Amino acid sequence: MSKNTIKVVELFAGVGGFRIGLEGASDAYETIWNNQWEPSTKHQDASLVYRARFGSKGHSNQDINTVPTADIPDHDLLVGGFPCQDYSVASTLSRSGGIEGKKGVLWWQIYRILNEKGDNRPSYIFFENVDRLLGSPAKQRGRDFAIILASLADLGYTVEWRVINAAEYGMPQRRRRTYIV
């Protein structure tokens, strides 16, 4: 690892989308630890794919709620696509759980890790979610996103965000996503 290496931790890693993108963009990025756990299934398929592609070193396949922050190495950049089911068009907005939903609450694990890292928290963050995050919950549109932004500000982060549609970048699908940097 060179002096100019950007050490990355990837939460809610799936099959490694952030890692593929970052490490493909520059040799400066090195993913040193990642976590992928799917609580609703016995088969941890995404974790198995991740390990098959990148190896087991630094890979955690356990419930993020149970991972002590001390087990997560210090890093420069925290990335993650925190679970979107409670914001997704797959459920009606009026029935989506948002930040209080079954998986929406996992946002607070990101906050916990950043908060508990204290002076060793990463300098940079990069998160992704569906665009409906901006309007959640239905009865208080925008509340959840405002809570997320305020939580990051309370930790000392200056945050920018954008909604980006993959179709505008030549992808053969309309896939609007919210990015928080």
PLM regions with names:
Residues 1-181:
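Conserved active-site and SAM-binding loop architecture
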